[in-house]
């Protein structure tokens, strides 16, 4: 089971479940939509994973702890004072029978983490469909390195970003002149999905390599120029 639960204006709370196992939840911008889904599906939460410390990813952490006081909450050191029960760094995390690769994807924030579970990449605000996150408390070199790391994953990796930014990102991607036919084709597909109030996500790494200009840059300088152009688009 892989479910993107809409939250706030354009966030997704990702819920992942393997058969006969508990649920893994990624980020918690608000509690109502998640708790309603968990109750309706009669599910048990095994863990909450936090990608970074921005409010639209941890805003309901205190409420989550009230609803689910026995659930462990894992997150980066930048979330240590926000209510996580276990601070983690890059490496391997084992929860129930889930073997989770914790990836260092700083750039958007300095200690941003991404999580790879059974070929599903939960990448927070590092990689979006056709785009990437802004650089805030991290730096451009970090973000470029993080994107190169994610780009090196298998093409069949299912990519689960935290925001529904795809339409705007595709509009910008068209202006770069890279793979315009593939970008235009995906833009038309996403327009139809969004008109039906359906998510454009998840995506795949194979598709992102075709339509995402930030995965096509070959140098840090090129990345910085592109990221600054997107910042004012």
Curated annotation (Swiss-Prot):
One Pfam family this sequence matches: HAGH_C
Signal peptide segment: none
InterPro entries (UniProt xref): Clx_II_MBL, Glyoxalase_II_hydrolase, HAGH_C, Hydroxyacylglutathione_Hdrlase, Metallo-B-lactamas, RibonucZ/Hydroxyglut_hydro
Cofactor(s) needed: Zn(2+)
Catalytic reaction annotation: an S-(2-hydroxyacyl)glutathione + H2O = a 2-hydroxy carboxylate + glutathione + H(+)
SUPFAM superfamilies: Metallo-hydrolase/oxidoreductase
GO term, biological process aspect, one: methylglyoxal catabolic process to D-lactate via S-lactoyl-glutathione
GO function term, MF aspect, one: hydroxyacylglutathione hydrolase activity
Enzyme Commission number(s) from the entry: 3.1.2.6
Annotated keywords: Hydrolase, Metal-binding, Zinc
Stored CDD domains: hydroxyacylglutathione_hydrolase_MBL-fold
Residues given in the record as Zn(2+) 2 binding sites: 56-57, 125, 163
Positions bound to Zn(2+) 1: 52, 54, 108, 125
Cofactor: how bound: Binds 2 Zn(2+) ions per subunit.
Pathway assigned in UniProt: Secondary metabolite metabolism; methylglyoxal degradation; (R)-lactate from methylglyoxal: step 2/2
Subunit comment: Monomer.
HAMAP family: Glyoxalase_2
Annotated function: Thiolesterase that catalyzes the hydrolysis of S-D-lactoyl-glutathione to form glutathione and D-lactic acid.
Family in the record: Belongs to the metallo-beta-lactamase superfamily. Glyoxalase II family.
Designated name of the protein: Hydroxyacylglutathione hydrolase
């Amino acid at each position: 089971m892989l479910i993107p639960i809409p939250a706030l204006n354009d966030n997704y709370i990702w819920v992942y479940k393997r058969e006969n196992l508990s649920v893994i939840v990624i980020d918690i911008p608000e509690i109502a939509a998640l708790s309603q889904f968990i109750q309706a599906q009669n599910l048990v939460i095994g863990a909450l994973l936090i990608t970074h410390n921005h409010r639209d990813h941890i805003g309901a952490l205190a409420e989550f702890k009230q609803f689910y006081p026995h659930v462990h909450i894992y997150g980066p050191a930048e979330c240590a004072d926000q209510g996580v029960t276990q601070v983690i760094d890059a490496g391997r995390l084992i929860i129930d029978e889930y073997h989770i690769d914790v990836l260092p994807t700083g750039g958007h924030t300095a200690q941003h983490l991404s999580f790879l579970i059974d070929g599903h990449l939960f990448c927070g605000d590092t990689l979006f469909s056709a785009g990437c996150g802004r650089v805030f408390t991290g730096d451009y070199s970090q973000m470029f390195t993080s994107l190169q790391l994610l780009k090196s994953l298998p093409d069949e990796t299912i990519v689960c970003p935290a925001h529904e930014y795809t339409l705007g990102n595709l509009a910008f991607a068209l202006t770069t002149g890279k793979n315009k036919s593939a970008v235009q084709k995906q833009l038309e597909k996403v327009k139809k999905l969004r008109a039906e109030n359906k998510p454009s996500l998840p995506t795949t790494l194979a598709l992102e390599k075709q339509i995402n200009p930030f995965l096509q840059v070959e140098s840090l300088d090129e990345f910085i120029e592109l990221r600054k152009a997107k910042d004012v688009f």
